[in-house]
Each structure stands twice: as C-alpha cells, then as structure tokens.
Amino acid sequence: MDVNPSPTRQVTLQRVGALFGDWRRLLISFAWFCAASSASLSIAISATRAQAPLLSGEQLILTALSVLGLACANFALTPALIWLRAPINPFVTSGLAVLSNAGLLLVCTDVWFDARLDGAPHPPLTLAAALAFGNALANGAIALDDDYTFLQFVLASLRYSERSAAPSKSRGLVIIEVDGLSYSHLRWAVALGFMPTVAELLSTSHTLARYDSGLPSQTSAAQAGLFYGVNHDIPAFRWYDRRHRRMVVSNHPEHAAMIDARHSTGQGLLRGGVSINNLLDGDAARALLTLSTLAPNAQRAAEHAYDDLIAFWFNPYTFGRTAVLSVLDLVREIAQALRERLARRQPRLDHRFPSRFTVLRMLTNVFLRDLAFFAVMREMQRGQPIIYATFVGYDEVAHHAGPSSLDALATLRGLDRHLRHVLTIARFFAPISYDLLLLSDHGQSSGAPFRQRYGYSLRELIDALTRAEVRVEEQQPRAAGQSFMNALLSEMDAASEQLRGVSRRRWRRATMRATVRTLRPRLEGDGETLVHRPSIIVCASGNLAHVYFEFGEDQRATLDQIEATHPGLIEALVSHPGIGFVVGTTAEAHVVVLGKGGQRNLTSGDVEGEDPLQPFGDVALRALQLLQLAQLPSSGDLIVNSAFYTDGSVASFEDQVGTHGGLGGEQTDAFVLYPRTFWFPQRPVSSAQALHCVLASWRGSALREPLGQR
C-alpha cells in the first residue's frame, strides 16, 4: 500500500494487472470467449458456404486461428482501453465489442475463406451483436461477485469519469468497522477460510489485537468513545431520559443527533473526512447513511454524499450486480432458516422466516454493504484524509442465527472481497497512500432468549412480581438494519431533490422517488414511544436491562424506596435463575451488585459472600465498568444483567440468539487489525474511549508522515 499512482504507462500497466489478477477467473472467461467465438464463426461460415464442400485442412487451421483471434480480441478489449486511459463504462465496451467483432468476422470470412457476408442471412453486425451480448451474459453469470468484474466495470470507470485529487505524498486512513464481530469469532472466520484477505494481511503486514469494549457493549456508546474519546450518559442502546421524560433510542436519527451534539467538540476522529453507514458522524465533513446527520435537529451540517448514492443507483453494472446478489442472499436466508428448522437446531428463532428480518438481511448484508464500499472507494479516489464505514450485515444475521453460526460467519466472505478491492484502490488508483484498519465496536454472545427459556419476558416477570394496579411497560426494539434502511430511503429522497430541474435526469429522479414510495411502508416499523405513563419502565438492550421506577422525582430511586413500594421484587429478581446480578443504589449513595450468593459494594470494594462478578471475567475491571455505568445520570434505578450459564451462553431480554449490551461471554471482546508499523499499547485497552487515543495517534502520524518516511 506504499505505492502511489503516477500518470506513467508503467503504472497504468500495473493497474491493468491489478484489475485482472484473478487467474482462475481469467481462464474460465477466456474459455468462454473461445467457445462463443467458435459458435459465432461457425454460423458465419455456414451462412456463406451452404452449398460448398467441407473445409480443407488449411482452412481448418485458419478457423482455429480465427477463433483464437476473436477470443483474444474480446478478452483484451477492456485492458487495452485501460492502457489507453480511455473512459470505461458498459456502453463504451459494448459498442466497441460489437464493432470489433463485426470487423473480425468480415476479415475471417472475406479474406481467409473467400466468402462474402453482405448478402448472408446473418449480416456481420447481427452476428457481432449476438456474440457481444452472449459474452456479456455469460461473463455476468460467471463473474457475478469477483474482483475481475467488479474492478473492471466499476473502479476503472470511477477513476476516469470522476474528478480525483492530484497525486500527493500525503497518507490517509480507511477504517472499516465490523459491527458485532468479536476477536475470537474473527479468528474463527479466518481459520474457516471465510476471510482470505484478512489472512493474507495477518501473514504479511498487519497485526491483530483485542480490546475490551466496556459497558454498555453496544454501538452508540462504542462509536461515541471511538470518535470523541468520551461516551458520557449513554447507559444502553435504549434508555429513559428522566429529566425530559422521554425514551431515547440510539438508532433514531433525532436521538443519534442528540448524542452527537452532546459529545462533539469539532475535533472528532473523522474531522475533515467521511462517515459512511454509521450511527454518529465523528465531526466528518462528508457523510452518507449516517443516522445523526439525517435528523432535522442535527446541529452540524455535514455535506451529504448524494453524488455517491446517485452514481451507485444509476450505474447499470453496480446496481444490477447488487440487486442480483441481494436476491441470491434472500434465497440463501430462506434455505438457511428452513435447514435450521428441519434440523431442530437450538437455540433458534422459530419466526426467522418468514419475517421482516428476511428482507432486512438481504438489504443490509448485500445492498448496504455494496453501497458503503462503493462510496468508500469513490472517496478514496478523492483523497479524503480519513474514511470510516460500518458493515452491519454480520451483526444483523448473528442476532438471528448466532455469532458463531456458519450463517453469520459466511456474511464475512463478501466483506473480505471488498477489503481486497479497497487494498487494490489504495495501491493503484488512490491519489494518496492509505493504511487500512479493521475493527469492531463489540462482540456478541450466544444463547436462547430469556422468553424462550422461561416462557415470559423480563417485563412480564416484573409485572407478575408487582401489585395489580402497577403498570409495567417495555420499550419495543427496532432492528438496527431497519434504521439504516430507513436512512437509505431518506438519503434517496433527498438525493432525488438534487436531480430536480435537470431534464436529462428526470427519469432518474422519478425512479428514486418511486422506489422510496414503494419500500418505505414496508420498512417503517412501529414507533418506540410509550403511550401511557407507567409506574415501571423496562428498557432492555440485549442481556442488559435498565428498570426505571416512577416516583414523581427526577433522581434515581434507592433500593430501600423500591423495596418499600414493591416488597420482595428485588429479592425475586436476584434469585431468578435467568438473572446473573442486579445493580442498585443504597440510601447512603453506595452502588452495590446483588447476586444469589453474595454482594459487592462497588463504591467501597467490600464483598459479602460470593462475589457476583466472579463469572464475568476480570473482576476489578468489571467492577469499575459497572460503577461508571450505574453513576450515569440516565441509568436505571435497577440494572439487570442476565445469567452467564455454565455452557458459556447468556439469555437476551430481546428476541435474539446472538446478543450484546451487557456482560457475559464474548460481547465485550472486540478487536482491531492494524499495520505492523503502527504503535499499539502494551497494556490492555479496556474501553472504546481508550482506543480513541490510539486511533487519534495513528491518524496524526498518518497525516503528518510523508510517503517513504516509515
């Protein structure tokens, strides 16, 4: 990745080699060209020699040479155009293919076989068009999802049709976040062969390190920590704001904008760069599919990368390829869900198919992935100093199939291919030299949901343990993938306005608006607001839940107050087999963790009986993390964490078999993959805020250090 492009013929040849580096694919493609050319030439000869004797030995040799010539011409067309630095797009290549095939067919028949095609039933242009069309269809089927086709028809066209920054000795960072992928699951995916590009990086240029994501182990807290170095008062993915008496949900654009506004100082990690497919913008100058930038109350006005969205949507190859792959992924999800049901695999979600998730998986795992990486590579060609994008497909599938399932790990195969594309762009096409980082915001732990284990939800349990007149409400979750798809529809709606008044783009605008009108009713779910004002509010985020008691006051209720109003509730929760511990505050303002065999005072450090945190890893670290979490202004009066069972599983309070948000298992076990030339601390990194310091130092080093200084 230390080679900068220059306008020399040698570098252009290197680019050609980069585009055509898949030799297995090349052999298959060339074999097809030979077969198609042979068939086309046979038709041409038979049309002119209906009454003529069979071909002589010399003519048979000429026929073989003709087939080889036609195949080579079709095969070398695009590399030749790249070498000449000509604009590449499907229309140019198709037109030149028809003309070149027509000319070669005329030469082969008129000169070598002494026959004229002008009066034949199949004129040369018709045969040439048929040959070119057949080649296009076959190559589309053969190379639907590989480097050769993607780079041939997308990257080259971007390089020569878009304005790129001038070559520079600057350096930049491309950071790809894999939502929900733990350190050990990444290693498992590499060992199983799902991520050959990552395996190659590990063996040549990069190092893999683990870090603890901290509490809560979820995306909004992690991204605030990674981008700004602080994630104050984000107690979970969803919580109750006592002061304003409202629900806050991290993947609602208005609430994401509020989180951004609270934490941004203008010096975020992404300042001057690009945010793609994230919850928060990190002070980026440009953004696409970033939830916090879509809200009317957004305080910062990041430039929306509508041009990337429009270019992707109306490129016949990229959109068509992604649409076909999305449908194939839909078929794959149906097959996997049926196989799981027939095999009676546990744990599993019986409503996995048919459900809204079936469509959401297709859109998040393929469509959003391809769009995000398409935008990443365009922004690399513009020479942006830092680009941060999130892949949400693994997290979405792992929630429904389990983080270690082959269904979830297989989603990483498509991500890995795009990482190879990014590396190719960085080496041969970007105007500056880029370093690639791969990281996760948290991991996931597996296990049957709480409701599936015990027949009722946490809300229903609390409802059963309180008096009849007590109203208990629970905030219903919305899938993260659904929020990003709604973000896509919002971006498309806004992008269509950019096309208003341009006559030659009216059909494009009409197409985008029609798509938005069709998909929005199907994707928009129920809101996450409370209709009534309940006595108790349960906000579950994975296997961690905040429970709020309404006493008419803004401050946190103490354990004594809760016991006096709802006698026996706390003891019943602590003793339940599906609950690992309960955190609350005493009348003396001490934070305590209550477990089945004992308790720990987080404020003083005193332990009575068995330490409730013993099963959850580093006890000192967990105690500090829980203390900090409980002291946040918006944390619940009670914080409930599920049990961590002897088989290593947890019980999500949501309807998930892969979960995160609390403690237990691998949900706090995140990773970062970075170049070996980068510094990384020897001491364990125990939070996203701590990793921000490392990332900020890497960014400063990358932007200061000219090429060749490392």
PLM regions: where:
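His/Asp/Glu-rich, glycine-adjacent segments
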Residues: 147-150, 229-386, 390-402, 507-509, ...
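Acidic, His- and aromatic-enriched active-site or binding-groove loops in soluble protein domains
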Residues: 229-241, 300-307, 409-417, 455-474, ...
